[in-house]
């Protein structure tokens, strides 16, 4: 067994069969030993958080300013490669927000990346539509779903809330400042080609205009 110098210990957790784990510190690094003094995790981490605080049976660890997770056997379940890892279930059930190279994504409860960290901003699920979250990259916006798929491509410079002008529709604008609508299936129901769009009336029509002409769009 490796000898550990300058050890400080803090009771962490008890297994179902009664085994206790302790945080140990050596040369400003943290690890875990069991009650027999055997290393479960060698002291190599800058920080070890309490087990079960973020994820059942896991502890968040920090290694050279990057974060990951280990389990109670000392196994690395999520490599310490993220700049930050948020709390589970904060955005979506069973997901935790991650940040890598300045970009955002999500991991699930098994530690798998269900949404790769490629986004500059991520919104809350349900803010625009049920099971959708807004995402943004390089100033362009779209939506992902709770299964991790992109339902609206990131091609709009702005997306208004649904139902603001017409029920179940959201006004969108592209990088050329052209306007159109998407519906709650993610379909572009009115092409993004207009310079202005006025509100729908009780007759379910709206005036839309380009630089050359004005037309009337009809809501089904």
Spans of features found by a protein language model:
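Bacterial Sec-dependent N-terminal signal peptides
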Residues: 1-21
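Residue-level detector of conserved, function-critical positions
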Residues: 19-220
């Amino acid at each position: 067994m490796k000898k550990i110098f300058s050890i400080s210990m803090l009771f962490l957790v008890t297994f179902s069969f009664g085994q206790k784990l302790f945080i140990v510190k050596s040369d400003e690094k943290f690890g875990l030993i069991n009650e027999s003094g055997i290393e479960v995790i060698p002291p190599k981490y800058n920080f070890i958080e309490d087990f079960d605080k973020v994820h059942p049976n896991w502890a968040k660890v920090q290694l050279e300013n990057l974060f990951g997770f280990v389990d109670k056997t000392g196994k690395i379940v999520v490599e310490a490669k993220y700049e930050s890892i948020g709390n589970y279930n904060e955005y979506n059930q069973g997901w935790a927000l991650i940040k890598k190279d300045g970009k955002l994504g999500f991991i699930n409860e098994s530690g798998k990346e269900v949404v790769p960290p490629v986004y500059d901003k991520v919104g809350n699920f349900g803010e625009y539509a049920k099971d959708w979250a807004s995402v943004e990259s390089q100033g362009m916006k779209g939506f992902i779903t709770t299964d991790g798929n992109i339902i609206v491509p990131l091609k709009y410079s702005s997306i208004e809330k649904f139902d603001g002008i017409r029920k179940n529709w959201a006004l969108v604008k592209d990088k050329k400042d052209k306007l159109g609508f998407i519906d709650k299936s993610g379909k572009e129901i009115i092409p993004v080609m207009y310079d202005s769009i006025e509100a729908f009336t009780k007759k379910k029509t709206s005036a839309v205009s380009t630089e050359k002409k004005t037309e009337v769009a009809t809501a089904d």
